[in-house]
């Protein structure tokens, strides 16, 4: 199954940290789509990355020990309240 982007959902970066996808924004000059995402640790800062790169496979040549197939992968987080 190909990787897909879902706004408002949590993704895990292949190095282990978690991020919330806030939006997709387009570059005003090129129209290239970028993912706007917030880190779910530390200061909760916002980050921006090209959509194609966000959804790309991990470079297994460079990161041969990476467990994930994709750079960012959607996480299914169960409700603490049981919903």
Regions inferred by a protein language model and the residue ranges of each:
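Mixed-charge, low-complexity intrinsically disordered regions
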Residues: 1-83
């Amino acid at each position: 199954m190909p990787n897909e982007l879902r706004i408002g959902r949590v993704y895990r970066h292949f190095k282990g940290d978690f991020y919330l996808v806030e939006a997709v924004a387009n570059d005003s000059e090129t129209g290239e789509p970028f993912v706007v995402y917030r880190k779910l640790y530390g200061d909760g800062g916002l980050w921006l990355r090209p959509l194609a790169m966000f959804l790309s496979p991990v470079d297994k040549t460079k990161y041969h020990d990476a467990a994930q197939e994709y750079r960012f992968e959607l996480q299914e987080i169960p409700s603490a309240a049981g919903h």
